[in-house]
Amino acid sequence: MAPTIRKSHPLLKIINGSFIDLPSPANISAWWNFGSLLGVCLIAQIATGLFLAMHHTADTSLAFSSIAHICRDVNNGWLLRNLHANGASFFFICIYFHIGRGLYYGSYLYKETWNIGVILLFLVMATAFVGYVLPWGQMSFWGATVITNLLSAAPYIGPDLVQWIWGGFSVDNATLTRFFTFHFILPFIIAAASMINLLFLHQTGSSNPTGLNSNLDKVSFHPYFSYKDLLGFVIMLGALASLSTFAPNLLGDPDNFTPANPLVTPPHIKPEWYFLFAYAILRSIPNKLGGVLALLLSIMILFLMPIIHTSKLRSLMFRPIAKTFFWALIANTAILTWIGGQPVEDPFITIGQIASGLYFLIFVLLIPSLGLLENKLLKI
């Protein structure tokens, strides 16, 4: 009998092995949907971004008015712009759920997949940051100024590094042009890195909620999980469409409706909501270099997860003590997000410092020590 084309064709058999006949654990829950949802987010962002780039002008004198032009004069431009801006928020919601799932169920023990994932997080954060500068509103300009200025904390090369990034002595036309370039190219780098992420994942297969070996109980990805993922797509795209049409500016900053003005500083400079937890950690340290290092470490600490895993059990499903502290970490991150949006005054400064300390304490001290404690309890 002639082999099926999807199994014999050089290109189709790669797709078949990744999305059709892929053996998947039968017991994976909806928490495993977020990987494919991230793929949908990326495709949606590239599609809407491509059309927006056709009408956007990366020039300080025209950028702000080109956004107004897109919203007023371009066919469905308002929808494209709102889908793209809110799509970024949904992208980060999916990323944070995806990372949370990985931490809870021990997915980080697939080291290569996890490390590529953390690199992807950095790339997505960089893309979102440079993209936020493009409308050239007040918060775009001052956000770019504040965040790029952090590089000046680097010893010896700091000031030169900042001027090199700026392309001059301040955030100006050269900065906007290069940020547009970065914002255009980075999503394609993210797409390539996502494929590497999938490649590594398919070497080992997916983990599952129990953290046990699931080779005895696997089903094909299609039709079971393709339809399960499809439900996730409908829910997410429905929520994105609803937010983009009914409350498109809910997550934005009102300051960004004012054109960038280097002579007027906004009363509270803050990034988009998805960066607030890291921004709170940055602000909680009075020293500039210390703050920058803490900011970097708040994400880079994820690289340590495979090293600090001391438990004999993979998943938190059977680890009641560690489970409690996982949710404490989630609550703590939520508190940091809230603090990041507050002005720098008491009691917010103190709360931010305590929450930042706890954030690192849970990762560096509690996760490894609780693993060892639970190992001892298993022997009793």
Swiss-Prot record:
Coiled coil: none
Single GO biological process annotation from the record: mitochondrial electron transport, ubiquinol to cytochrome c
GO cellular component: mitochondrial inner membrane; respiratory chain complex III
Domain of life: Eukaryota
GO MF terms, alphabetically ordered: metal ion binding; ubiquinol-cytochrome-c reductase activity
Entry's transmembrane regions: 34-54, 78-99, 114-134, 179-199, 227-247, 289-309, 321-341, 348-368
Residues given in the record as a ubiquinone binding sites: 202
Major place of residence: mitochondrion
Residues the entry annotates as binding heme b b562: 84, 183
Keywords from the UniProt entry: Electron transport, Heme, Iron, Membrane, Metal-binding, Mitochondrion, Mitochondrion inner membrane, Respiratory chain, Transmembrane, Transmembrane helix, Transport, Ubiquinone
Cofactor note: Binds 2 heme b groups non-covalently.
Similarity comment: Belongs to the cytochrome b family.
Protein name per Swiss-Prot or TrEMBL: Cytochrome b
